[in-house]
């Protein structure tokens, strides 16, 4: 059975182990290459300018894909980005980053506890110097009101791996215990919505 055409070469503009695993499990042949983009600066600028999270996620995904597509004009380059946004008590919309360490992950998870947040997950495809496709998936996840003792046990069990996730949790592992409700495609929560990508 042919799942993928021989051409064009598929390139993932990401070093994310989770995204690579999603593509591998779908039986796709691809190369994963880093895109030298200052994500933090782009994200900070977008937030400061009041750009909606959906537009900011597309902008970040596109920056990654475009950077590699200019070097690899015949390839089909997939760029991805994911933003976590959550309304807070003061009605502001807070944008979260990957925690720097477990102490930061603890603070972040306490801020998300008992709230519903959105994972704005953008995917773009570039080929021949132009964007030819884009998708934005927005799963909604509600954390239960867990105790601090539970949180400390979770952090000890998962360790530094949590710092690789914008949420400070891994839904595909023990992080599932943190939630009372999850809405949206599982692969979108993990950072690469496979259903729309494979339809494209």
Label every PLM stretch briefly.
Residues 2-10, 47-200:
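Anionic-ligand binding patches
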Residues 18, 38-40, 131:
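Surface-exposed, flexible loop/turn segments at secondary-structure boundaries
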Residues 15, 35, 128:
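Cofactor-binding loop segments of dinucleotide-utilizing enzymes, especially the Rossmann-like FAD-
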Residues 30-40:
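A short beta-strand-loop structural module common to alpha/beta enzyme folds
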Residues 41-47:
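Short, charged, surface-exposed secondary-structure boundary motifs
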Residues 28-31, 101-102:
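Glycine-rich, phosphate-binding/catalytic loops in enzymes
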Residues 2-28:
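N-terminal beta1-alpha1 ligand-phosphate binding loop
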């Amino acid at each position: 059975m042919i799942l993928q055409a021989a051409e064009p070469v598929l390139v993932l503009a990401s070093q994310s182990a989770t995204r690579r695993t999603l593509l591998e499990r779908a039986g796709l042949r691809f190369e994963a290459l880093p895109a030298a983009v200052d994500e933090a600066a782009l994200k900070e600028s977008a937030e400061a300018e009041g750009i909606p999270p959906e537009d900011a996620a597309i902008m970040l995904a596109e920056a990654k894909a475009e950077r590699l597509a200019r070097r690899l004009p015949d390839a089909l380059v997939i760029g991805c980005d994911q933003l976590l946004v959550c309304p807070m008590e003061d009605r502001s919309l807070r944008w979260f980053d990957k925690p720097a360490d477990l102490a930061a992950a603890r603070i972040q998870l306490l801020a998300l506890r008992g709230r519903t947040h959105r994972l704005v997950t953008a995917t773009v495809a570039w080929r021949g110097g132009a964007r030819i496709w884009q998708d934005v998936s927005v799963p909604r996840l509600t954390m239960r009101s867990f105790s601090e003792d539970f949180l400390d046990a979770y952090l000890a069990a998962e360790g530094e791996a949590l710092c690789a996730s914008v949420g400070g949790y891994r839904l595909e592992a023990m992080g599932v215990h943190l939630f009372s409700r999850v809405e949206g495609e599982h692969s979108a929560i993990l950072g690469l919505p496979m259903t729309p990508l494979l339809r494209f």
